[in-house]
Amino acid sequence: MTDITIFPTDWRAEDVVPDKGESFFRINIFGKTAEGKTVCVQTKFTPYFLLEVPESWSPARTNLFITETAMKYDAVRPMCLSTKRKNMWGFDGGKMRNMVQFVFKTQAQLRKAKYRLKDQYQIYESSVDPIIRVFHLRNINPADWIRVSKAYPAQTRISNSDIEVETSFQHLGPVEDKTVPPLVIASWDIETYSKDRKFPLAENPTDYCIQIATTFQKYGEPEPYRRVVVCYKQTAPVEGVEIISCLEESDVMNTWMKILQDEKTDVSIGYNTWQYDLRYVHGRTQMCVDDMTGEDKVKLSNLGRLLSGGGEVVERDLSSNAFGQNKFFLLDMPGVMQIDLLQWFRKNRNLESYSLNNVSKLYLGDQKNDLPAMQIFEKFEGNAEDRAIIAAYAAKDTDLPLKLLKKMAILEDLTEMANAVKVPVDYINFRGQQIRAFSCLVGKARQMNYAIPDDKAWATEGKYEGATVLDAKKGAYFTPIAALDFASLYPSIIRAHNMSPETLVMEKRFENVPGVEYYEIETGLGKFKYAQKNDETGEGQGVVPALLDDLAKFRKLAKKHMAEAKRNGDDFKEALYDAQQRSFKVVMNSVYGFLGASKGFIPCVPIAASVTATGRKMIEHTAKRAVELLPGSEVIYGDTDSVMVKMKLPDDKVHDMDEQFKMAKWLAGEITKDFRAPNDLEFEKIYYPYILYSKKRYAAVKFEEPDEKGKVDVKGLALVRRDFSPITRDILKESLDTILYKKDTPTAVSETLERIRKVLDNEYPMEKFMMSKTLKTGYKNECQPHLHVANKIYERTGFPVPSGARVPFVYIEDKKNPDIKQSFKAEDPTFAQDNGLIVDRLFYIEHQLLKPICSLFEPLLDDPEKEIFGHRLIKEKIENLKNVFKADLKVAKRVKKNIANNQREITSFFKKK
């Protein structure tokens, strides 16, 4: 037996049904040692659930029930034991319930027993993922160093790992180690070919996968250590890149998989690999078949660390706020962590375009080599030097994802989120917030001796009120406005008032238990009561508040470590701890939504309703107290967790920022005293000036220190909305800068008039008018500009725009069909520019500029539309454009009429000189 320490990269679980012997459940842990050895740990685990038995049963009756039930449902009788746990559903004074832990050899047996027993008995925790269960039982993190003790060589190897061992799950344990794991990261990309000069389709026999480029880099190292491009057909050398030429396409894919194996790849990354590259590779393997034997020439089973079973197709159809509607196509790589950077950016960043070129330019100041698809096709048909140009292009495409991975700390973001909630990294990629919050609750409930019941939900009718928004006193405030914000309001409310499913009073008999204090709140769903903890002893604290306490402490500690790492110049640890603290924050904020869901693991809508109702009361109380503490002050707005106060100060102190900061801090501190800890009303910023348009819509200069310059802060205006063109945002931003920084409205109006004139005179480049929308799968209404442009691109190039991609477009003038639907005037910006087309200036004035500009100046001018768009010069130019439109329309109608009557235009009888 031996002890080893590994850093896990993948967790797999399965019911194993051997040819001989009994079935069992196994968890396979893949990882790497500090010395760079690959490891596979086989560990058996017996899944279980809890079942509540009647309180009246004697020990003998319970034992008989255990024996009979174990025999009937193939449970492991020696491991099925009586236990006592508290029920995490409804306040009952912390009563211990009689329960039985039924243990099974396989998940299939567990599910069968649960299905048969659930109508007769209350089942607990049958839906807990066994892998997650092990994380909590052994207090280990899914993406952190773990100790594997008492391990012995595996009797039957299932992987190609350097080391393969077996051990009991009880011999897994945590290791306090933040050493950088020597993970090998492989960034890869494919290049494809179409003989017909159309978009390559894997099912077309001659649409080859012509090159696969891969760049290898060790995690934490500054530079890659190997760049290799496997090429179909002879390819000339490329400086700094290893070129491997193959005679057959199948050899390209087999060689690439062997390289991944030889390099002991731990993390596979790419850009759009889940929607294109992996699907294409799979499609080409179906075409690579031996004509004589009919056998596959490419063995996808060589992907990953298993001896067999790699390369299986995994299709996922996901619809979420983060991803939208998307279909993902993966080839399974057991033992290897897969990351598609495109999906990470879609989920975590709000961008105009998610192309690798745009993202790299934005975050790295770097770009791809420009090599259009048609040139790739031509160069593939050329000589070895031509194909080397493709290889250099492909290698560059694999460098950029590695740089983005490091720059954006993407690996740290995924692994630290996985560690914070104790779920595998794969769950972070493909599953929602529910599983994360549930895993956290499972762990905390176990610590506090609670069991989470299956199939519990609060039956509610109607909807509860959302967060409070105080009436907005619209206007332009050229005096300082103090912003008072509650720190982590919803998690703090839950902690302060002990809100949890097992502290919520659900039965009348527990409404007035002697010695128990209650918090009562009226909501849109009714009145709810929560048993409160003893502040001196902590007794009676709920599971959810206790969990949030822990997360708050963990976050505070992570921020402390992050600051230390920053002082020490340790960039790796700084990024690691920053990812940690952000993960804890996300989890804390997700618990409210987890409990408020109508469906899920343990939905408890009353808690969500109680939290928002309490938040409303706190916002209203803050507004009231601010005016009481500083008579003459005015609350001009209040949102979910913040209140804006125009403080009444002596005339000579109104514009004194030091005094404003001093009084705002005092005000926040005084009001905080009215609330139960840990609720904390903070003061962090002054807005000056502050233009309030309506609820959730404002523009201001934000000061976080009294002596700083301040930064523009905008919410809800067209300036920050992606459905407006750059010209709209640019004009609004430039106008706002003049209003906010110079406090000069007349000059802002003059500058805006000049910018509108330039639009009407077509003096701005076309990219300023470009918009983009995400292409989805299937539309009820097909009159969509981006769909129309996507269809045009396909007709012209043969290249379909993939679902999920953002399609750029501009609206152009169409003199031949001026009255067609606006969506049909949408055009591909590149095509429009190359063909000298002119943007539809009337459309941009009427639909992109008129309303946003008038809205911007509404609090500042009596009649913005009249003063700006009714200005003589602007009005005249707009009328001229409208007259041209009418003339074009008249001509177009005459031409259509003549065509319908089979008549020629008189102009057709004359020739141009």
Swiss-Prot record:
Reactions mediated catalytically: DNA(n) + a 2'-deoxyribonucleoside 5'-triphosphate = DNA(n+1) + diphosphate
InterPro entries noted in UniProt: DNA-dir_DNA_pol_B, DNA-dir_DNA_pol_B_CS, DNA-dir_DNA_pol_B_exonuc, DNA-dir_DNA_pol_B_multi_dom, DNA/RNA_pol_sf, DNA_pol_B_thumb, DNA_pol_palm_dom_sf, DNA_pol_type-B
An annotated GO BP: viral DNA genome replication
Pfam families: DNA_pol_B (PF00136), DNA_pol_B_exo1 (PF03104)
GO molecular function terms noted in the UniProt entry: 3'-5'-DNA exonuclease activity; DNA binding; DNA-directed DNA polymerase activity; nucleotide binding
EC numbers: 2.7.7.7
SMART domains: POLBc
Region (Contains conserved residues essential for 3' -> 5' exonuclease activities): 182-401
Keyword tags: DNA replication, DNA-binding, DNA-directed DNA polymerase, Early protein, Exonuclease, Hydrolase, Multifunctional enzyme, Nuclease, Nucleotidyltransferase, Transferase, Viral DNA replication
Induction comment: Expressed in the early phase of the viral replicative cycle.
Stated family: Belongs to the DNA polymerase type-B family.
PANTHER family: DNA POLYMERASE CATALYTIC SUBUNIT (PTHR10322), DNA POLYMERASE DELTA CATALYTIC SUBUNIT (PTHR10322:SF23)
Task performed by this protein: In addition to polymerase activity, this DNA polymerase potentially exhibits 3' to 5' exonuclease activity.
Protein name as annotated: DNA polymerase
Organism: Paramecium bursaria Chlorella virus 1
Source taxonomy: Viruses, Varidnaviria, Bamfordvirae, Nucleocytoviricota, Megaviricetes
Gene name, Swiss-Prot/TrEMBL: DPO
